[in-house]
Amino acid sequence: MTQIAVIGAADASPDEYTTALAVGLLIAENKGTLICGGMGGVMEAACKGAHDKGGVTVGIVPDNGNGNSHLDIVIRTGLGHGRNVLVVQSADAVIAIGGGYGTLSEIAIALKLNKPVFGLKTWDIDGVVKCETPDDAVLRAARAAPPSPLYHTRQAGEEPL
């Protein structure tokens, strides 16, 4: 199962919110797990899209709070922006939507870790693959992501690892 991180600003514009909602829905449709920073804006919209479609959402939150209401799993870190490393490290691929300096830090970490990064109206940086639509970004992320050795969901009838 592919784990895709969706990163972007907590104070998303209406266009970024709509884009993130579509990205989350498409991740769920493609049986991916959505990883994010667990807060509002882009993160909340992506989680809502995935959750509404029956997908699994994981929020790695910066404090001891509960994150947004569309999270299936909440990981409380108490690390502040340091949790950005965990968000990116947990993912097989990253989709950046808009964003400010927090998003920039996550992109830099992802590139340093050789994670594939796909951007929708985000920072113009070498290594970030520009995508025009949510469909394009999710399809590219799913294709680029290697199978995750960090996480496995057992299917009905499948033997434990």
Role assignments for model-derived ranges:
Residues M1-V58:
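Glycine-rich beta-alpha loop segments
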Residues G8-D11, G80-P147:
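C-terminal binding/interaction regions
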Residues E16, A45-C47, S69, S105-I107, ...:
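Short glycine-/acidic-enriched loop or helix-start segments at secondary-structure transitions
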Residues K31, L71-D72, A91, N114:
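Short, well-ordered alpha-helix to beta-strand connector turns
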Residues M39-G40, P62-G65, T122-I125:
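Short, ordered loop/turn segments at secondary-structure junctions
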Residues K53-P62, I75-R76, V117-L120:
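Short hydrophobic/aromatic-enriched beta-strand-loop microsegments
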Residues I60-S90:
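Glycine-rich oxoanion-binding loops at beta->alpha junctions
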Residues R154-G157:
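Short Gly/Ser/Thr- and charged-rich N-terminal loops/segments
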